[in-house]
Amino acid sequence: METATLIAISISGLLVSFTGYALYIAFGQPSQQLRDPFEEHGD
C-alpha cells in the first residue's frame, strides 16, 4: 500500500477509537462519577 493510504487509515482508526472512548466516558459506567455543576448550584 502507499504511504498516504496507511496514514489515512491510521488517522481514521485513531479518530474512531477516540470517539468511542469519549462516548464510553460520557454515557458508560464511569459517567456515574462525573459531577453535575447544575445540580450542585440548586436555585
Swiss-Prot record:
It is a single-pass membrane protein. Signal peptide: none annotated. Its main location: plastid. One of its GO terms (cellular component) is chloroplast thylakoid membrane. It is found in: Plastid, Chloroplast thylakoid membrane. The keyword Cell cycle does not apply. Pfam families: PsbN. Keywords: Chloroplast, Membrane, Plastid, Thylakoid, Transmembrane, Transmembrane helix. The chain crosses the membrane at residues 7-27. One of its GO terms (biological process) is photosynthesis. Belongs to the PsbN family. May play a role in photosystem I and II biogenesis. This is Protein PsbN. It comes from Glycine max. The lineage of its organism: Eukaryota, Viridiplantae, Streptophyta, Embryophyta, Tracheophyta.
